[in-house]
A protein has these predicted regions:
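Long, compositionally biased interface segments
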Residues: 26-29, 231-287
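Surface-exposed beta-loop interaction hotspot
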Residues: 112, 118-182
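Short strand-coil-strand connectors
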Residues: 58-60, 87, 110-112, 191-195, ...
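Broad, structure-driven detector of short, well-ordered beta-strand segments within folded domains
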Residues: 62-67, 72-77, 113-120, 197-201
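Forkhead-associated
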Residues: 49-99
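Phosphate/adenylate-binding glycine loop and adjacent helical scaffold
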Residues: 89-117, 124
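Hydrophobic, proline/glycine-rich low-complexity stretches
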Residues: 2-5, 9, 13-40, 44-61, ...
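Acidic/His-leaning functional-site neighborhoods
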Residues: 186-234, 243
């Protein structure tokens, strides 16, 4: 049988030109945001406090309530007619939905298109995130607008580790000015066009997340700012390829609460590289 994807012998070689590599990356980004649990599929994030009464959650059946303090997850009550499945089992009565902070987080499926999972805050609160693979945002999505590739904004910087890291408060979009501490493991420094920069990025998985804004923010790019994943090299250097700057999840759904750029990460100059805005099919801004 012929492999519909083509054999290794006939597969097209991977692109090596930076602009072509970027085009492949951007195509994959547009595919990822429309996945069943991609950014555009998120229709609700509902926090349920420790002392809350059982309550409905928009977009999914059942009534939801907290577990005992210190126990990961939420409790749901539903009838078999609701069609709600937790870890593959139809709920007819009560079920415990383990949070993503548990070694074995629960899966929740309400229909062919609606799913959910429980997230935890750093303070130990829990919320249900509801995803709809046929959300209005997915139906209206027209693409991610972006700048052309810019060699100017591939910057070589120095990374100076901070022993033990430094706790730094980051404001978040929905927190009314309150900050959440993130550990910044080192300083990112470079000089460009005669200006010295010192940036702060916090750990996100195996890499560092740089949250920044610039003179394009709120003009030709998303107003809250943009993200850039970076990774220091063993020799103490770090490459900031702003062509890979991407829109934060909150640019796709109001149900995300994104960190905002600290003062030192707010560039006074325009960075005309990377993603710009989420577009609707008619070319207007989706949000």
């Amino acid at each position: 049988m012929t492999d519909p994807a083509g054999s290794a012998a006939t597969a097209a070689p991977a692109p090596t030109d930076p602009a072509e590599v970027l085009a492949v990356y951007r195509s994959r980004r547009e595919q990822m945001v429309v996945l069943p649990q991609g950014n555009l599929a998120l229709v609700n994030t509902q926090w349920i406090s420790h002392d809350a009464d059982p309550q409905p959650v928009y977009g999914i059946p059942g009534t939801w309530s907290p577990l005992e303090p210190g126990v990961s997850g939420l409790r749901v009550r539903a009838s078999a007619d609701d069609g709600l499945r937790v870890d593959g089992v139809l709920v007819d009565g009560e079920a415990v939905v383990r949070g993503r902070d548990d070694p074995r987080p629960s899966s929740v499926v309400a229909s062919d298109t609606v799913s959910a999972f429980v997230i935890a805050s750093e303070e130990g609160a829990y919320a249900l995130r509801v995803w709809d693979a046929q959300s209005e945002a997915i139906r209206d999505f027209g693409g991610i607008d972006a700048f052309p590739y810019s060699e100017e904004w591939v910057v070589e910087a120095d990374f100076t580790p901070i022993e033990g890291g430094r706790a730094m408060g980051f404001e978040h979009l929905k927190d009314d000015g309150a900050t959440k501490d993130k550990i910044v493991p080192g300083e990112i420094t470079f000089t460009k066009d005669g200006v010295d920069y010192s940036l702060a990025a916090f750990r996100e998985g195996r890499a560092l997340l740089l949250v920044f804004s610039d003179a394009t923010s709120g003009e030709s790019t998303y107003g809250v700012g943009r993200f850039l994943m970076v990774a220091p090299s063993p020799d103490g250097t770090i490459t900031l390829d702003f062509n890979r700057a991407y829109l934060p999840p909150c640019a796709f759904s109001y149900n995300f609460n994104c960190p905002m750029p600290p003062k030192q990460n707010r560039f006074a100059v325009p960075i005309e590289a990377g993603e710009k805005n989420v577009l609707a099919k008619d070319g207007t801004l989706l949000h």
